[in-house]
Design a protein with these regions (language model features):
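Short, low-complexity, charge-dense intrinsically disordered segments
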Residues: 1-15
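Bacterial N-terminal signal peptides
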Residues: 13-23
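Charged, low-complexity intrinsically disordered terminal segments
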Residues: 24-175, 181-351
Length: 351
């Protein structure tokens, strides 16, 4: 951030705040009640965990990993996890589009909640535009579903002005992407939820990579979710609407959701029987690579700090200093400041 922008921000912020405070619009209730919660603690009691147990016993202390490259397989795996979940589903995403893919997955998650599965969904607020607050508040009205927004702008109707007034805070976004079932199976990677990420749009060709995993590392993935979920920056969606949707609103929203899903065409089959779903997971299990693994995640408190060097950078620098032959990295973005570029070039020249 250059100094000119900081000067501009300091001059403009008081004006923007005055405008926003004077506007008759919905603002976030930061004192909205929040109840802490954590991941399911007994994944070994679930049916899906039993599918992996024999293979896991042969690789004590290791986790199973499977790379999921194609969009179709990535989406079907998420649907299988939603359909087979028995205890919990945790989802954390930067973007959850309200297109066909977003509605289909939301519908399957609703079915899981109807079966008694506890659902927690954490979405970054950056793309919560229009009437999305009311829509997800209606979904949040389900007794087994709770949705929170990460680091929301205070003023919901004057988002652009609010963003400028609070730039120092709201410029810190949550790009984490994970989907965890019963704390037994997890999926992490580069895909958000939307048509463009799963091979549905003919005019887009996004190339992303997911990792489906089981074993000890799933507990680490869940712990990272809990850290963000229980942070002061994760705000219940009910805090973002002036009036909570009624039960009639919720039922009407869910009916339209189901109708839209049923009416939507899709380029590949998305409905499978329970036996077919289990067979899909067994096939993945039989191709697992068993290895040690670790989860690296920035702490949500970075929203309130200007620290340049975070957990990820420190870990990457450490790995680079230890590498003997090669290091493989796949990332949709690899943008480095000049100082970091020189550092990594030094490691490359050393070998």
């Amino acid at each position: 951030m250059n100094s000119n922008f900081h000067r501009f921000e300091r001059i403009l912020r008081p004006v923007l705040i005055a405008v926003l405070l004077g506007a008759c619009s919905t603002t976030v209730n930061w004192n909205y009640p929040r109840v802490p919660s954590n991941a399911f603690t007994y994944p070994e009691t679930t049916t899906v965990d039993a599918l992996f147990q024999e293979a896991s016993d042969k690789h004590p202390g290791l986790s199973g990993f499977s790379l999921v490259q194609h969009g179709e397989n990535a989406f079907l795996a998420r649907l299988a996890m939603a359909d087979l979940a028995e205890k919990t589903l945790d989802a954390q995403y930067y973007i959850w589009d309200s297109d066909t893919t977003g509605r289909i997955l939301a519908s399957r998650i609703m079915r899981a909640a109807d079966r008694g599965v506890r659902v927690r969904i954490l979405i970054d607020d950056n793309y919560q535009t229009g009437d999305k607050d009311f829509v997800i508040a209606a979904l949040d009205g389900h007794p087994n579903i709770e949705i929170r927004l990460f680091n929301p702008v205070r003023n919901r109707l004057w988002r652009t002005l609010s963003f400028l007034a609070e730039f120092g805070r709201v410029n810190h976004r949550m790009h984490n992407k994970l989907f965890v079932m019963d704390n037994a199976v997890g999926m992490v990677g580069g895909r958000n939820i939307g048509d463009v990420y799963f091979g549905v749009r003919a005019d887009h060709n996004y190339r992303d990579l997911d990792v489906l995993t089981t074993g000890p590392i799933v507990g680490e993935i869940s712990a990272s979710f809990d850290m963000f979920w229980n942070s002061e920056w994760a705000i219940p969606v009910g805090a973002t609407v002036k009036e909570l949707p009624t039960e009639k609103d919720r039922k009407g929203m869910l009916k339209r959701l189901e109708e839209n899903v049923n009416a939507a065409g899709y380029p590949y089959p998305i409905y499978e029987s329970p036996d077919e779903l289990r067979s899909r997971l067994v096939q993945i299990r039989d191709n697992f690579i068993w290895a040690p693994g670790s989860v690296l995640v920035e702490h949500p408190s970075r929203v309130n700090t200007e620290a340049e060097i975070g957990v990820i950078h420190k870990a990457l620098s450490q790995r680079l200093s230890e590498v003997e032959r090669e290091i493989l990295i796949e990332s949709p973005y690899f943008v480095l400041p000049e100082r970091r570029s020189r550092e990594y070039s030094t490691h490359r020249e050393r070998h």
